[in-house]
Amino acid sequence: MVICGMEKPYIVDQKFEKESTLAMGEYEHCIFKNCQFESEDFKNFQFVDCTFESCNLSLVKLSGASLQKVHFKDCKMQGLRFEACNPFLFEVSFDTCVLNLSSFYQIKGKKTKFAGCSLHEVDFTEADFSEAVFDDCDLAGALFDQTNVSKADFRSAFNFVIHPSINQIKKAKFSPDGLAGLLQGFGITIG
Protein backbone atom coordinates (compact mmCIF):
# COMPACT_ATOMS: atom_id res chain seq x y z
CA MET A 1 0.00 0.00 0.00
CA VAL A 2 1.29 3.46 -0.89
CA ILE A 3 -0.27 6.53 0.66
CA CYS A 4 0.67 9.92 -0.76
CA GLY A 5 -0.18 13.31 0.63
CA MET A 6 1.50 16.59 1.40
CA GLU A 7 4.27 14.76 3.25
CA LYS A 8 6.64 12.14 1.88
CA PRO A 9 4.99 8.90 0.65
CA TYR A 10 4.12 6.20 3.19
CA ILE A 11 4.87 2.73 1.79
CA VAL A 12 3.67 -0.38 3.67
CA ASP A 13 4.14 -4.13 3.11
CA GLN A 14 5.99 -3.83 -0.20
CA LYS A 15 8.83 -5.93 -1.59
CA PHE A 16 11.58 -4.26 -3.61
CA GLU A 17 13.93 -6.45 -5.68
CA LYS A 18 17.00 -5.46 -7.67
CA GLU A 19 16.31 -1.74 -7.25
CA SER A 20 19.10 0.81 -7.56
CA THR A 21 17.21 3.92 -6.45
CA LEU A 22 14.50 4.53 -3.91
CA ALA A 23 12.04 7.41 -3.57
CA MET A 24 12.27 9.30 -0.30
CA GLY A 25 9.50 8.18 1.99
CA GLU A 26 8.43 6.28 5.07
CA TYR A 27 8.79 2.52 4.56
CA GLU A 28 7.11 0.16 7.00
CA HIS A 29 7.16 -3.67 6.94
CA CYS A 30 9.02 -3.60 3.62
CA ILE A 31 11.58 -6.05 2.24
CA PHE A 32 14.50 -4.96 0.08
CA LYS A 33 16.25 -7.83 -1.70
CA ASN A 34 19.30 -7.79 -4.00
CA CYS A 35 19.19 -4.00 -4.24
CA GLN A 36 22.20 -1.91 -5.28
CA PHE A 37 21.92 1.27 -3.22
CA GLU A 38 25.67 2.01 -3.06
CA SER A 39 26.33 5.74 -2.43
CA GLU A 40 22.59 6.58 -2.48
CA ASP A 41 21.29 9.41 -0.31
CA PHE A 42 18.80 8.18 2.31
CA LYS A 43 18.60 11.59 3.99
CA ASN A 44 15.43 11.78 6.12
CA PHE A 45 14.14 8.39 4.91
CA GLN A 46 12.26 6.37 7.51
CA PHE A 47 12.46 2.57 7.74
CA VAL A 48 10.31 0.78 10.34
CA ASP A 49 10.27 -3.02 10.74
CA CYS A 50 12.07 -3.44 7.41
CA THR A 51 14.51 -6.08 6.15
CA PHE A 52 17.40 -5.56 3.75
CA GLU A 53 18.68 -8.83 2.29
CA SER A 54 21.69 -9.28 -0.01
CA CYS A 55 21.84 -5.54 -0.67
CA ASN A 56 24.81 -3.26 -1.31
CA LEU A 57 24.43 -0.25 0.97
CA SER A 58 28.07 0.82 1.05
CA LEU A 59 28.65 4.56 1.45
CA VAL A 60 24.90 5.28 1.72
CA LYS A 61 24.32 8.72 3.23
CA LEU A 62 22.20 8.37 6.38
CA SER A 63 21.76 11.99 7.49
CA GLY A 64 18.52 12.15 9.47
CA ALA A 65 17.48 8.65 8.37
CA SER A 66 15.33 6.76 10.83
CA LEU A 67 16.16 3.06 11.34
CA GLN A 68 13.60 1.49 13.68
CA LYS A 69 13.73 -2.31 14.04
CA VAL A 70 15.62 -2.73 10.77
CA HIS A 71 17.32 -6.06 10.03
CA PHE A 72 20.21 -6.41 7.59
CA LYS A 73 21.10 -9.87 6.24
CA ASP A 74 23.97 -10.71 3.89
CA CYS A 75 24.48 -7.02 3.10
CA LYS A 76 27.58 -5.09 2.11
CA MET A 77 27.54 -1.92 4.23
CA GLN A 78 31.03 -0.46 4.18
CA GLY A 79 31.75 3.09 5.27
CA LEU A 80 28.35 3.89 6.81
CA ARG A 81 28.05 6.62 9.44
CA PHE A 82 25.25 5.41 11.69
CA GLU A 83 25.70 8.40 14.01
CA ALA A 84 24.14 10.55 11.25
CA CYS A 85 20.84 8.67 11.73
CA ASN A 86 17.93 10.01 13.70
CA PRO A 87 18.53 8.54 17.19
CA PHE A 88 14.80 8.27 18.02
CA LEU A 89 13.91 4.57 18.43
CA PHE A 90 17.13 3.55 16.61
CA GLU A 91 17.23 -0.25 16.50
CA VAL A 92 19.14 -2.42 14.04
CA SER A 93 20.43 -5.99 13.78
CA PHE A 94 22.96 -7.55 11.42
CA ASP A 95 23.35 -11.10 10.11
CA THR A 96 26.43 -11.97 7.99
CA CYS A 97 27.03 -8.38 6.90
CA VAL A 98 30.24 -6.59 5.93
CA LEU A 99 30.33 -3.35 7.94
CA ASN A 100 34.03 -2.56 7.53
CA LEU A 101 35.05 1.09 8.07
CA SER A 102 31.60 2.02 9.39
CA SER A 103 31.01 4.22 12.42
CA PHE A 104 28.69 3.89 15.40
CA TYR A 105 30.15 6.94 17.18
CA GLN A 106 28.01 7.77 20.25
CA ILE A 107 25.22 5.43 19.07
CA LYS A 108 22.87 3.97 21.65
CA GLY A 109 22.88 0.39 20.39
CA LYS A 110 21.91 -1.49 23.53
CA LYS A 111 21.07 -5.17 22.81
CA THR A 112 22.12 -4.90 19.14
CA LYS A 113 22.82 -8.28 17.57
CA PHE A 114 25.72 -8.82 15.18
CA ALA A 115 25.99 -12.39 13.83
CA GLY A 116 28.76 -13.55 11.51
CA CYS A 117 29.72 -9.98 10.60
CA SER A 118 32.95 -8.42 9.41
CA LEU A 119 33.51 -5.32 11.55
CA HIS A 120 37.05 -4.35 10.50
CA GLU A 121 38.05 -0.89 11.71
CA VAL A 122 34.52 -0.05 12.85
CA ASP A 123 34.37 2.92 15.24
CA PHE A 124 32.43 2.24 18.45
CA THR A 125 33.82 5.33 20.25
CA GLU A 126 31.60 6.63 23.09
CA ALA A 127 28.79 4.28 22.01
CA ASP A 128 26.52 2.22 24.25
CA PHE A 129 26.49 -1.40 23.10
CA SER A 130 25.66 -2.84 26.51
CA GLU A 131 24.03 -6.28 26.25
CA ALA A 132 24.94 -6.43 22.55
CA VAL A 133 25.84 -9.77 20.99
CA PHE A 134 28.88 -10.13 18.73
CA ASP A 135 28.37 -13.72 17.57
CA ASP A 136 31.20 -15.03 15.37
CA CYS A 137 32.22 -11.48 14.40
CA ASP A 138 35.64 -10.35 13.16
CA LEU A 139 36.51 -7.10 14.96
CA ALA A 140 40.03 -6.60 13.55
CA GLY A 141 41.04 -2.99 14.07
CA ALA A 142 37.67 -2.00 15.59
CA LEU A 143 37.94 0.99 17.90
CA PHE A 144 36.48 0.79 21.39
CA ASP A 145 37.14 4.05 23.25
CA GLN A 146 34.92 5.15 26.14
CA THR A 147 32.48 2.48 24.91
CA ASN A 148 29.92 0.76 27.12
CA VAL A 149 29.97 -2.96 26.37
CA SER A 150 28.83 -4.09 29.82
CA LYS A 151 26.94 -7.40 29.65
CA ALA A 152 27.84 -7.71 25.95
CA ASP A 153 28.63 -11.16 24.59
CA PHE A 154 32.01 -11.50 22.84
CA ARG A 155 32.42 -15.26 23.46
CA SER A 156 32.63 -16.18 19.78
CA ALA A 157 33.99 -12.83 18.51
CA PHE A 158 37.62 -12.60 17.45
CA ASN A 159 40.44 -10.16 16.61
CA PHE A 160 39.15 -7.51 19.02
CA VAL A 161 41.17 -5.24 21.29
CA ILE A 162 39.18 -3.71 24.15
CA HIS A 163 41.06 -1.82 26.85
CA PRO A 164 39.29 -2.47 30.19
CA SER A 165 40.71 0.75 31.66
CA ILE A 166 38.95 3.06 29.16
CA ASN A 167 35.78 1.06 28.41
CA GLN A 168 32.90 -0.22 30.53
CA ILE A 169 33.07 -4.02 30.36
CA LYS A 170 31.41 -5.09 33.62
CA LYS A 171 29.71 -8.49 33.24
CA ALA A 172 30.65 -8.73 29.55
CA LYS A 173 31.22 -12.30 28.38
CA PHE A 174 34.49 -13.40 26.77
CA SER A 175 35.92 -16.80 25.88
CA PRO A 176 39.36 -17.78 27.22
CA ASP A 177 40.66 -17.34 23.64
CA GLY A 178 39.53 -13.71 23.68
CA LEU A 179 41.42 -12.70 26.82
CA ALA A 180 44.43 -11.57 24.79
CA GLY A 181 42.25 -8.85 23.26
CA LEU A 182 41.57 -7.49 26.75
CA LEU A 183 45.20 -7.54 27.85
CA GLN A 184 46.91 -6.22 24.72
CA GLY A 185 46.71 -2.61 25.90
CA PHE A 186 48.74 -3.50 28.98
CA GLY A 187 51.76 -4.75 27.01
CA ILE A 188 51.29 -8.29 28.29
CA THR A 189 52.37 -11.20 26.10
CA ILE A 190 50.30 -14.37 26.29
CA GLY A 191 51.59 -17.71 25.03
Language-model-detected regions and their locations in the chain:
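Tandem repeat scaffolds
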Residues: 2-191
